C-alpha cells in the first residue's frame, strides 16, 4: 500500500514541479523570435538569393551564351537559347530560370566566365501563381539594372575570397 502512495505522490507532485520549473526557465530566458517585416536578422555576405543578369557599363548585356551555367545546374532550372550576331559573337535570345526548381546552390554564378549571372541578397520575393517564379531574360536584366550598385559592391567585397 505504501508503494502505491509513493507512486501517486511522486507522479502528481514531483513531476508537476519539474515541469513547471522547466517552463519557468524558458519563460524568463531571452526570446529569439523576430517580428519579421519590421525587424530583420543579419544576412551573411555570401547569401544567395534572387538571380540577376548584369550588363557592362556601356549597356550591353554580359552573357556570351556559353551555356556553362545551364550545363552545371544540378536542378536543370536554367534554359538558354542563343544565336550568332552579324559581328560573329554569340548572344542569348532566351535566358530563363525556373525558381521553383532552383536550389540556390550558386554553381551558375561560379561557372560564369564573364560574371553575368549573379545571385543577389534579395530574399523577399514571391509569386501568387507558379508562373510568377519563372524569370525570363528581361526580368533578370531588370533585377540586375535595379540593384547593380549593391551587386557590384558585394562582388568587390567578396573578391578576395573567390
Swiss-Prot record:
Named cofactor requirement(s): [4Fe-4S] cluster
GO cellular component, one term: plasma membrane
Top EC class of this enzyme: translocase
Subcellular localization: Cell inner membrane
Entry-linked SUPFAM superfamilies: 4Fe-4S ferredoxins
An example molecular function term from Gene Ontology annotations: NADH:ubiquinone reductase (non-electrogenic) activity
Catalytic activity: a quinone + NADH + 5 H(+)(in) = a quinol + NAD(+) + 4 H(+)(out)
Gene Ontology biological process terms, A to Z: aerobic respiration
Record membrane topology: Peripheral membrane protein
EC number assigned by the record: 7.1.1.-
Residue span(s) of domain 4Fe-4S ferredoxin-type: 53-83, 93-122
Entry keyword set: 4Fe-4S, Cell inner membrane, Cell membrane, Iron, Iron-sulfur, Membrane, Metal-binding, NAD, Quinone, Repeat, Translocase, Ubiquinone
Cofactor note: Binds 2 [4Fe-4S] clusters per subunit.
Binding sites annotated in the UniProt record for [4Fe-4S] cluster 1: 63, 66, 69, 112
PROSITE patterns cross-referenced by the UniProt entry: 4FE4S_FER_1 (PS00198), 4FE4S_FER_2 (PS51379)
Principal localisation: membrane
Function, as annotated: NDH-1 shuttles electrons from NADH, via FMN and iron-sulfur (Fe-S) centers, to quinones in the respiratory chain. The immediate electron acceptor for the enzyme in this species is believed to be ubiquinone. Couples the redox reaction to proton translocation (for every two electrons transferred, four hydrogen ions are translocated across the cytoplasmic membrane), and thus conserves the redox energy in a proton gradient.
Subunit structure comment from the entry: NDH-1 is composed of 14 different subunits. Subunits NuoA, H, J, K, L, M, N constitute the membrane sector of the complex.
Family: Belongs to the complex I 23 kDa subunit family.
HAMAP family: NDH1_NuoI
PANTHER family assigned to the protein according to its UniProt record, in alphabetical order: NADH DEHYDROGENASE [UBIQUINONE] IRON-SULFUR PROTEIN 8, MITOCHONDRIAL (PTHR10849:SF20), NADH DEHYDROGENASE UBIQUINONE IRON-SULFUR PROTEIN 8, MITOCHONDRIAL (PTHR10849)
NCBIfam families on file: NuoI, PRK05888.1-4, PRK05888.1-5
Protein name per Swiss-Prot or TrEMBL: NADH-quinone oxidoreductase subunit I
Organism, as annotated: Herminiimonas arsenicoxydans
Lineage of producing organism: Bacteria, Pseudomonadati, Pseudomonadota, Betaproteobacteria, Burkholderiales
